[in-house]
Amino acid sequence: MVRDRVIELFRKALAQGADDGRWPAADAGFSVEAPRDPKHGDFAVNAAMVLAKQAGKPPRELAQAIVEAVRAADTAGDLAGLEIAGPGFINVRLSPDLWLRTLARAVAEGPAYGRTAVGQGKKVIVEYVSANPTGPMHVGHGRNAVVGDGVQGLLRWAGFDVSREYYVNDYGAQVQTLARSVHLRYQELHGRAVTMPPKSYPGEYVKDIAAGLKAEYGARFLDAPEAEWLTLFRDHAVQHVLGMIREDLAAVNISFDRWSSEKALYESGTVDRFLRFLEEKDLVYVGKLPPPKSKKGQPPPQAQPDEEGVTAAEDLTLFRSSAYGDEVDRPVKKADGTPTYFCADIAYHWDKRQRADALVDVLGADHGGYVPRLEAAMEALGASRKDLHVVLIQMVSLMRGGESVKMSKRAGTLVSLREVVDEVGRDATRFIFLTRRSDAPLDFDVELAKKQTLDNPVFYVQYGHARLAAIFQKAREAGHAVPEFDLDAARTLGSPEEQDLIRRIAAFPDLLAAAALAYEPHRVAFYLQETIAAFHSWYTQGKKSGEKVIGPDPVKTAARLFLCRALKQVLANGLAVLGVSAPDRMESPETRDIADDV
């Protein structure tokens, strides 16, 4: 990375200055960032401002001394200019040759170009999807799955040791409701008239589960008391639905390293051990929740059960989460002694933290209020809040013909992820889910996703990769060998458009590292769209101006082909990060072979 070269030179200069007694520290944790205005240079370094107090000198005076030391350290001539700006920033301009050499690096590293070691092998567990095993995955789950997979992929490229994890909520009331729904369909299959309650699960898959149980057990549980069949029906239904979920995930090329069961946390004694741990650390006590707040001028409302089924009137075992920044203390054990869902959830995070250095949770935006209590739990358990990062996923609206498709979970009219993938394809599904920030609502236009036009964002990027492949096909037909890097030839890449593409290629590793540390895979999708737009513009302009990639000047042709070679590699790598294919052949928007368009 060109940024790495700047850091290397400044560290070398600072170390030499420290040895000479010109300032007190060799590495003061300075930053190297691209300035907002490119006119100010390629990078801005704040080393003088960071060191000024320790050195006992004004920042601008110290900056001048650092500039002299950096110039002395730059024996290879990689820096074209160093200027002092503002309160003491050092603006850095890189030599044109240093930029050009990044093309050689991109080609030499090939499929590994963009990988960095910023993660230093740190163990991270990324938990995503974790949809309740009560039905097939809908499009909202799909966005969570793709964003989560993008996050874990970025972390791998940045040098983290990543484990992908799915938390299966197979213990609570919802899976019992599923079991009862299956039993009603089981009765129906035996000829009985049944009425499905409002909160039951209405999908056809429930009938399939019931049919499997009927085939295996006949009428054995038709009139049996619930205690005899509830656990069996629950476990059978959960396994059936998990099979559906695995198939849905496979359709978008997503798999997990570990499936963690909530039920297993109880059966293994993990939840009980965790409760004892809380008691030993004096992190819990018996008390009541605060009463519900009344609106101004109105009587206090009646205490209603919360999402855990507990009320302010009961004696509960409360976790001291308010001491760690939460609004109130949270119940971990109900009045009847049974653990709450929150208890099992923080026990799960306690277990995960023992297996990793850091945790990433990818949750629906409706869980935003849940985050402070998780952060409080992490801190109370001796970890840092920074050891947990939560990525929130906003809603998805499915669009068809310019209108929103109405979906209702209760009415059973949710559009499944599988339906969308079957209609628009894996690549379009994955890429479009990443065309907006995860914390912003997304309109998924099904008709647009199917179009083979440049209005379709995934087609636009893949078309660019295929056009680059077609350029090399044409070059071979014209007798041009696949070029190797030649610095003298590369110096002919002087147009503003070519310089822009070179800088975009050079920025790719930094882009991936920054996106990984921010847990934002959409940055890669944005980069690919912007970079391919720059390529299409350069390519089209070259055809109009007579400066084609494959032209009469063999030196310029070799240089432009090498630029295309590096760019093609970056596009392929960027698409790979997002789990999207990079085809070499496609139909052009006008339905002719793309090779005819180069």
Swiss-Prot record:
Main location: cytoplasm
GO cellular component, one term: cytoplasm
Superkingdom, natural source: Bacteria
One Gene Ontology term from the biological process aspect of the record: arginyl-tRNA aminoacylation
Major enzyme class: ligase
GO molecular function: arginine-tRNA ligase activity; ATP binding
Subcellular location: Cytoplasm
Catalytic activity: tRNA(Arg) + L-arginine + ATP = L-arginyl-tRNA(Arg) + AMP + diphosphate
Keyword Ribosomal protein: no
UniProt-annotated stretches for the region Disordered: 288-309
Transmembrane segments: none
Chain span(s) of sequence motif 'HIGH' region: 131-141
Catalytic activity, EC: 6.1.1.19
SUPFAM superfamilies with a match to the protein in the record: Anticodon-binding domain of a subclass of class I aminoacyl-tRNA synthetases, Arginyl-tRNA synthetase (ArgRS), N-terminal 'additional' domain, Nucleotidylyl transferase
Keyword set includes Repeat: no
UniProt keyword list: Aminoacyl-tRNA synthetase, ATP-binding, Cytoplasm, Ligase, Nucleotide-binding, Protein biosynthesis
UniProt subunit comment: Monomer.
Family: Belongs to the class-I aminoacyl-tRNA synthetase family.
The protein's name: Arginine--tRNA ligase
Organism: Anaeromyxobacter dehalogenans (strain 2CP-C)
Species lineage: Bacteria, Pseudomonadati, Myxococcota, Myxococcia, Myxococcales
Gene: argS
